[in-house]
Amino acid sequence: MKLLRQLLALCAFLSVAASTPSSLAAETPKDIVLTGDAICTSCHDEADSPELLAIGKTRHGTRADKRTPSCTSCHGQSKDHINYKGPAKPPKPDVTFGAKTKVAAEARNDACQECHKKDAKRSHWEGSIHQTRDVACTSCHKIHVAKDPVIDKRTQSETCFNCHKEQRSQGSKPSHHPLAEGKMACSDCHNAHGSVGPSLMTRNSVVETCYTCHMEKRGPFVRSHQPVQEDCAICHNAHGTTTESMLKTRPPFLCNSCHGPHMPIQPALSSGPKAASAVTGWWDASVITQGKSCVSCHSQIHGSNNPSGLNPNPQRLFR
């Protein structure tokens, strides 16, 4: 009887052992973490390609996450590359992402969007200016590095400036947003993956984007200044200018681009010729010698509860 029990136990053990591989195969995903990667790292090791293995320090190389892709998830099956046994360099993988790649941007982006397509920030990629100009994800993003420079505020702008050279120049002017200081990033105003706003703005309009930080300019005011409601870029260049407050040009020249000349508020100040000054926009050339400009009186440019955006205490102007 004892011998019979031992034989039955042995048969049961062998039966389970025989069925285990097939059952595991049925439960195991086709492309689990590091499946097939061992083949890649047999050549692309620390001695041959140390920079490639830095991906292990990123989300793309987190073994504990079942969503983590394998090499072939991005580079394709690449059978010719993997199975090559010749003395020369093997053929390239099916999908490559380097600066010299001949793979179309659309094919490279498709590899990324296999995972990154359910994010609201990327919902407007199709038809965006970057997509229609064949910008690839890897034109901006670096995958095989411990930290992607475009995600870090301190280094993001340098990535953008590789293409947007005019904005780099403007950002070096005296009046600018603090990108160079690392306090802001291009993505604070722009969504590089596409948006419904102009110039890839994060909001639906320029003013709505600006108001996310400059709420005090929004109002409501009894008397609003129309450009503030329409487009901040009418007066400002957000990337940088040589004029205070990032104005495109200084008052009164900026004001005169929309507003015509008018009489001084105190005729007693008038002592010059009665022709409108081309410099000040006033019917009084003496204002120039007083160091006045439009904003000396109309100080509440963005909106005011006073007529014409006048200073709440105009008597201070003439002390």
Enumerate the language-model features and the residues they cover.
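Short sequence/structural segments immediately N-terminal
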Residues: 3, 22-319
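Bacterial N-terminal signal peptides
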Residues: 8-19
